[in-house]
Structures are given as C-alpha cells and as structure tokens.
A protein has these predicted regions:
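Acidic, polar low-complexity linker/tail segments
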Residues: 2-61, 68-75, 90
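Conserved beta-strand scaffold positions in the cores of enzyme catalytic domains, especially
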Residues: 96, 177, 203-208
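VWA/integrin I-like adhesion module and closely mimicked acidic/polar interface patches used
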Residues: 155-201
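C-terminal "exit" segments of structured domains
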Residues: 206-256
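Extended, alpha-helix-rich binding/interface surfaces that flank or overlap catalytic cores
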Residues: 137, 146-153, 192, 196, ...
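Loop/turn elements at helix/coil->beta-strand transitions in domains of secreted/extracellular proteins
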Residues: 90-93, 144-148, 173-178
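Von Willebrand factor
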Residues: 55-152, 156-161, 184-191
Length: 256
C-alpha cells in the first residue's frame, strides 16, 4: 500500500489556552497576537489523516506513554515496533499513537511497512506532562477495522468514569485494549487494577512490561499482532511457534 503522510495535527479547543489580549501598535503586535492565539491550538492534538474508502486489512493502534519519566521504556519499545508488522507480513496495518507533554502529539497513518513504522517511532521524543490515554482511545474508536489497541504505560491520571465509558464502547465495537504495564516504579502498581478494569471491559488484558527485556517485548508484540489478525483461534494455533503467545493467552484467560 502507499503510505500516507506521517501525521496531521488539528486544533483541540478544550486544551488550548485563551487567546492573548489584543494589542495595538502595528503589524508586529498583530503578528505576535496571531501567533499566541494559533500556535498552541495547532500543536495541541493529533489525529490520523482522513480516510478514503473502507480498510481491507485488520488494524492495530500501538499507543505509548512518552512522558518524561518514560524515556527508558520508550527507548526499548521503539526498537521492536517492527515486530507488529513482521509477525504476519502484509496482513495487518499499524498506526503509532503517542502522548507526552499532556497531549496526544502523534497519531500516524496506518501502515504495514516495517521500515516506515520504525522511522516514525524513531522521531518521537519524551515530554513531561500528565497521561493522555483517553484521547487515544477516543480517536481509535472513530477508526474503522481497529481490532486491538496495545498500550505501554505505567500510571493512569485521567477520569476513570470517562475511561470506563470509552472502554465499554470499544468493547461493543470489537476493539480490544491490551496494556503492557510498566511497574518499574513501585508507585505505578496502584494503577494495575485501573488498567485491568479498562482492558477487561474491551475483552483485553494487562501484561507486565519490562524495559530491560527487549526480546520478550518483541515476542509479546508479535503475539499481539497475530491476535489482532486472527483472534484467539489463530493465536492458539501458533502458540508453539510464537514465544509470546503462551503469555498473552494466559493473561487473556485471566479476564474471565
């Protein structure tokens, strides 16, 4: 397939600051006022490009918490993103969604090209701020054919009631949320129940994430890709050839 542009940024009125007071004094003042008003809105949110036609392949959204404390985890994750499309070449399209700096700043077009996905991941940097998983879930809900959202994160700092509503809607649509939960920081463990609550509502699950074990992460992502294409049936058929399949199936069984 032909790749679309990397990502498109759109205004997010809810998170944009109020416009600066009008100034007088000529062209320079008017220019400063315009920049103050428009730049925060332009860079506040991201969504994938508008779609033409109906997707022909299953889709997966690879979502990552790239706040400042997450740099070690993101460094590990960006090295193995290609596993998502290499597991079943040509059978799954993947989009990269990233939040950092208290906003979703990246939501790429869907692609099944491993090099394209790796290049897009390489360009992401971590920024300090609160988590923004829910806007990623909301945007994913509007996309067609998304079978799985796999999210790497440690804490949840948003509205749980809103998260539950989104998770219920994703579940009705047939989109599973799979969370790779990083508990390297002991304070993150308190959010395990929250992530399980959201994931189970979609029919998904939560697995532990270890930034120091990139090989295991690659195995898990490969298994998630197979699950996105063929569900539990295909995952069970390939469990002997996929090192991550057994772990994923074990955690999927825990949701029941």
């Amino acid at each position: 397939m032909t790749d679309k542009p990397n990502f498109v940024l759109i205004p997010d009125d809810a998170s944009s600051p109020s416009p600066a007071p009008a100034r007088t004094g000529g062209l320079l003042s008017r220019l400063l006022t315009t920049l103050t008003t428009t730049l925060p809105a332009i860079f506040s949110h991201a969504e994938p490009p508008a779609e033409i036609g109906t997707p022909t392949r299953p889709r997966l959204v690879f979502a990552v918490d790239a706040t400042a404390s997450r740099e070690p985890a993101w460094a590990a994750a960006r090295q193995v993103t290609d596993a998502l499309v290499k597991a079943l070449p040509g059978e799954l399209d993947v989009a990269l969604a990233v939040h950092g700096g208290t906003r979703v700043h990246t939501f790429t077009a869907f692609t099944n090209d491993a090099n394209t996905l790796r290049d897009r991941a390489a360009g992401v940097v971590c920024e300090a701020g609160m988590t923004r998983l829910l806007p990623i879930l909301a945007t994913s809900l509007k996309q067609q054919q998304v079978r799985v959202i796999v999210y790497i994160g440690d804490v949840f700092e948003e509205s749980l009631p809103s998260g539950r509503r989104l998770a219920d809607s994703l579940g009705l649509q047939g989109t599973k949320l799979i969370v790779l939960h990083d508990i390297a920081d002991p304070s993150a463990r308190r959010d395990a129940e929250v992530f399980w609550d959201l994931a189970k509502r979609t029919g998904g699950c939560v697995l532990p994430f270890d930034a120091s074990a990139s090989g295991r992460l690659r195995d898990i992502l490969s298994a998630v890709a197979v699950y996105a294409v063929g569900g539990e049936k295909l995952l069970r058929e390939r469990r002997h050839a996929l090192p991550g399949a057994v772990a994923l199936l074990d955690h999927l069984d825990r949701r029941r």
